[in-house]
Amino acid sequence: MNIHNLFPTPIGFFDRAITDEEKLFILNLEQRPNLGNTTSTNNKILNGMTALRSFIEESVNLYFQSTVRPKHDVSLRITQSWANFSSPGQHHHKHAHPNSYISGVYYIQTNPNDRIYFYRDEWKQIKFPSENYNEYNSESWWFEAFEGRLILFPSSLTHMVPTVEGDTTRISLSFNTFPVGVVGEEVELTGLRLEV
């Protein structure tokens, strides 16, 4: 038997140590309530963190070029960036990111067992319990979330981070992107030029 992976979902991983200055910048951000945790009131925090922004932009570009391989001159721009704060007993609710193409999360501070869960919303009508879960039969899949880890994913992919079970507040930086440049194809009547 041969099995082919048709339309796989790319999840990108990049690592970079957070600097003391960057961490202090994040810790001093004003916060507001969110569903299950708190988030920064500033939703463009990467504007104040040039080196980290450059790392994230380079990672997003590599991910985009490697997975989409666009024919025309198009790139992704970061539209919003904010910090999430989950104290012990708090969580980050299940959600996706509308009005964005690729989203990402960079972990600033974590506990040993922190994870991010991704979900697929197909097969809700019929469920088959499995003896061994894998990429084909799972409704969700998780990856470790640790300090300095950047995870990129399609913005439409539902995800969440469970309740903090350790003693440390989990802090992450999230962001959205949107294409700038030529999208679609003029001769196919799908062409669109998006400019800032």
Predicted regions mapped to residue ranges:
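Non-heme Fe(II)/2-oxoglutarate
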Residues: 1-74, 82-84, 91, 191-196
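Catalytic core of non-heme Fe(II) oxygenases with the double-stranded beta-helix
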Residues: 83-152, 162, 169, 179-192
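A short beta-turn/loop motif at secondary-structure boundaries
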Residues: 74-76, 165-167
